[in-house]
From Swiss-Prot:
The homeodomain-like HTH domain mediates nuclear localization and heterochromatin association. Residues 1-94 form a propeptide. GO terms for cellular component: chromosome; extracellular space; nucleoplasm; transport vesicle. The full-length protein can be released from cells and is able to signal via the IL1RL1/ST2 receptor. However, proteolytic processing by CELA1, CSTG/cathepsin G and ELANE/neutrophil elastase produces C-terminal peptides that are more active than the unprocessed full-length protein. May also be proteolytically processed by calpains. Proteolytic cleavage mediated by apoptotic caspases including CASP3 and CASP7 results in IL33 inactivation. GO terms for molecular function: cytokine activity; interleukin-33 receptor binding. This is Interleukin-33.
């Protein structure tokens, strides 16, 4: 007679079995799950002229959670991985002692212009220290630049100013971003930019393709009486000025007062 064999069987309910299987499956498929959350830090920097710079540094906080195993007694281990995102700088308000100029709304990310990206753009009218308007006229399929008095009902021409960070330290004069002075390009109409002709000491409108030549860039200086001046990037000490009712390049000696009236301009939204 064969001995009887005894078997010990633990009964598991159907509901409990399904629950256990579900947990095991989830653990197997999601052993290492990652969740990314974006975090941003915003701070503001007010320059001497009132130019308000908004700095926004964003990064992703990626949280990796390892599912517990039976051996670890369901202990959780977490670690944070910080992935830095590209820092964005935008000029939130532009005020060289004036109420501000109209903000050109579209954001720019065109890195093809001389290898740098513009910070922002503004559309403004350009006038002299004596409130004469800078106008642009199409004559014989080319543009001419004039400095003249306008009638009250005449509409002022607008110029699109694109702002860039220059390599010149902002400690010299004027305003800057991240320790560097600002420089601008000026475009009164599409595909045309003000261009410094250093040989002829003149300011001309050139139809250009990107990348723009260095002659199209001017270092921006903040001046008294709500004025600014534009210094040639390619020829330090030479500024855009007014001569015989036209724009011209004027050399200003460093020992002289850079506040001379013929190189001072005003920017306005009207």
């Amino acid at each position: 007679m064969k001995p009887k064999m005894k078997y010990s069987t633990n009964k598991i309910s159907t509901a409990k079995w399904k629950n256990t299987a579900s947990k095991a499956l989830c653990f197997k498929l999601g052993k290492s799950q990652q969740k990314a959350k974006e975090a941003c830090h915003v701070y503001f920097m007010k320059l001497r002229s009132g130019l308000m710079i908004k700095k926004e540094a964003c990064y992703f906080r990626r949280e990796t959670t390892k599912r517990p195993s039976l051996k670890t007694d369901r202990k959780h281990k977490r670690h944070l991985v910080l992935a830095a995102c590209q820092q964005q700088s935008t000029v939130e308000s532009f005020a060289f002692g004036i109420s501000g100029v109209q903000k050109y709304t579209r954001a720019l990310h065109d890195s093809s212009i001389t290898g740098i990206s513009p910070i922002t753009e503004y559309l403004a009218s350009l006038s002299t220290y004596n409130d004469q308007s800078v106008t642009f006229a199409l004559e014989d399929e080319s543009y001419e630049i004039y400095v003249e008095d306008l009638k009250k009902d005449e509409k002022k021409d607008k110029v699109l100013l694109s702002y860039y960070e220059s390599q010149r330290p902002s400690s010299e004069s004027g305003d800057g971003v991240d320790g560097k002075m600002l420089m601008v390009t000026l475009s009164p109409t599409k595909d045309f930019w003000l261009h410094a002709n250093n040989k002829e000491h003149s300011v001309e409108l050139h139809k250009c393709e990107k990348p723009l030549a260095d002659q199209a860039f001017f270092v921006l200086h903040n001046r008294p009486s709500n004025c600014v001046s534009f210094e040639c990037k390619t020829d330090p000490g030479v500024f855009i000025g007014v001569k015989d009712n036209h724009l011209a390049l004027i050399e200003v000696d460093s020992s002289e007062n850079l506040g001379t009236e013929n190189i001072l301009f005003k920017l306005s939204e009207t």
